From Swiss-Prot:
Annotated domain remarks: The Pro-rich region of rgm1 attached to a heterologous DNA binding domain is able to repress the expression of the target gene.
Reported induction: Under the control of the inducible GAL10 promoter.
Organism whose genome encodes this protein: Saccharomyces cerevisiae (strain ATCC 204508 / S288c)
Locations listed in the record: Nucleus
Name of protein: Probable transcription repressor protein RGM1
Single GO MF descriptor: zinc ion binding
Organism lineage: Eukaryota, Fungi, Dikarya, Ascomycota, Saccharomycotina
Length: 211
């Protein structure tokens, strides 16, 4: 059976309260511990250092914050949320991190991507000279001559039609289009010029041959 505890002496209790609230004439309260005095001073200053990491609401006392989280945000897994917040803080401190955490947005925690260390050139249609000027010149340990180096002379390219031109284009065109050639004789000798007649003469001679 539990024994009776001795009654607290009011005189001894008042003596042990060594931490008194000063700076506020209307307040004469004293406390046994420094954290109790600090918590009391927040009532005068209106300071609320404890913030809810879910709804971002501030509280002056840690016990009020815990009570708020257990009653209002009872369906939220606080341990998982703390791990996500620690991972987000470590990622935000990493300069190479560019990831976002969409699962933290409902809780007011957003990780911004790291800025790009340099500006990339915009790919726009430009001449080769403009494209080369976007980049830094190459580094050479020895001084380069300022005058341009002459390139070896190259012959001009051949025209495309030089090897596609037909042979008959090199000859003069025939002016009389009515000239026909008679069939050759039984011998394989080439036809003589006398056997070549005009188309009009052959037409006139055809009725005489029938007579």
């Amino acid at each position: 059976m539990r024994g009776k505890q001795p009654k607290r002496n009011k005189d001894n209790a008042s003596v042990k309260r060594n931490y008194r609230c000063v700076g506020y004439p209307d307040c004469n309260m004293s406390f046994n511990r420094t954290e109790h005095l600090a918590r009391h001073i927040r009532k005068h200053t209106g300071e609320k250092p404890f913030q809810c990491n879910i709804c971002l609401k501030f509280f002056s006392r840690i016990d009020n914050l815990r009570q708020h989280q257990s009653s209002v945000h009872s369906d939220v897994d606080l341990m998982s949320l703390r791990r996500l917040q620690q991972s987000a803080n470590s990622t935000a401190n990493d300069p190479n991190a560019t990831r976002m955490f969409p699962q933290l947005r409902p809780y007011g925690i957003v990780v911004q991507p790291a800025p790009v260390p340099y500006n990339l050139p915009i790919s726009t249609p430009a001449s080769p000279q403009d494209t080369i000027s976007l980049y830094a010149p190459p580094y050479f340990p020895h001084p380069m001559p300022s005058a341009p180096i002459p390139l070896p002379h190259q012959p001009p390219p051949l025209p495309i039609y030089s090897y596609m031109q037909p042979l008959f284009l090199n000859h003069t065109p025939i002016q009389n289009h009515n000239i026909v050639e008679l069939p050759p004789d039984s011998s394989d000798t080439p036809a003589s010029p006398s056997k070549v007649q005009s188309f009009d003469q052959a037409k006139d001679a055809s009725p005489n041959a029938k007579k």
